[in-house]
């Protein structure tokens, strides 16, 4: 069964003014779609074609070596972006059990945001910043390229795309401005659902 590009759960312009329509169109229709196309070309006709993407990424060492790099890059790109679209929303409300536990662990939501933003804005090159559940505890981690915390046995619940294609049309080289804007469109309801399932 071929992997498919998911539809966005909102209109292309729904995240304005924080992420502009043109960026969303390029990011979803071009960049994400390319990962899906290349992933399908890699796994077509193999046993991986019938495996879940999460299992593939979590067990990357079991993927045949000839396909491993493509699954890591293109499978990671597909998984990461699919989750990224889900944790964004034009209706962002900072509430839920995950917010309570963030405050309990970091002291305040602002302290958490500051640490997350520092890791995101200082990440060299392209990659992702994540809030993960690791042995029942929340942790902020970064990964290069399209790598995913699942490979390290950690469950992602919130992620921030630090690739330039995610923000350059609107923010150019101002990654901190893009990071600040991100907090206005986080779908905390979805993040909390992922958190409760991962605990």
Curated annotation (Swiss-Prot):
SUPFAM superfamilies: Fe,Mn superoxide dismutase (SOD), C-terminal domain, Fe,Mn superoxide dismutase (SOD), N-terminal domain. InterPro entries: Mn/Fe_SOD, Mn/Fe_SOD_BS, Mn/Fe_SOD_C, Mn/Fe_SOD_N, Mn/Fe_SOD_N_sf, SOD_C_sf. Fe(3+) binds at residues 27, 81, 161, 165. Keywords: Iron, Manganese, Metal-binding, Oxidoreductase, Stress response. It is an enzyme of class 1 (oxidoreductase). Mn(2+) binds at residues 27, 81, 161, 165. Belongs to the iron/manganese superoxide dismutase family. This is Superoxide dismutase [Mn/Fe] 2.
């Amino acid at each position: 069964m071929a992997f498919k590009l998911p539809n966005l759960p909102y209109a292309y312009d729904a995240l304005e003014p924080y992420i502009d329509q043109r960026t969303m169109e390029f990011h979803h229709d071009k960049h994400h779609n390319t990962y899906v196309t290349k992933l399908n070309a890699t796994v077509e006709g193999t046993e991986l074609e019938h495996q879940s993407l999460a299992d593939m990424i979590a067990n990357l060492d079991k993927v045949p070596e000839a396909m491993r790099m493509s699954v890591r890059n293109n499978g990671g790109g597909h998984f990461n972006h699919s989750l990224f679209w889900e944790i964004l929303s034009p209706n962002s409300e900072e509430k839920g059990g995950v917010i309570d536990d963030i405050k309990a662990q970091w002291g305040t939501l602002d302290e958490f945001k500051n640490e997350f933003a520092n890791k995101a804005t200082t990440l060299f090159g392209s990659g992702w910043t994540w809030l993960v559940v690791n042995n029942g505890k929340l942790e902020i981690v970064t990964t290069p390229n399209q790598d995913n915390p699942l490979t390290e046995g950690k469950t992602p619940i919130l992620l921030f795309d630090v690739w330039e294609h995610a923000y350059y049309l609107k923010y150019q080289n101002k990654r901190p401005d893009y990071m600040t804007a991100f907090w206005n469109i986080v779908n905390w309801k979805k993040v909390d659902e992922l958190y409760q399932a991962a605990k």
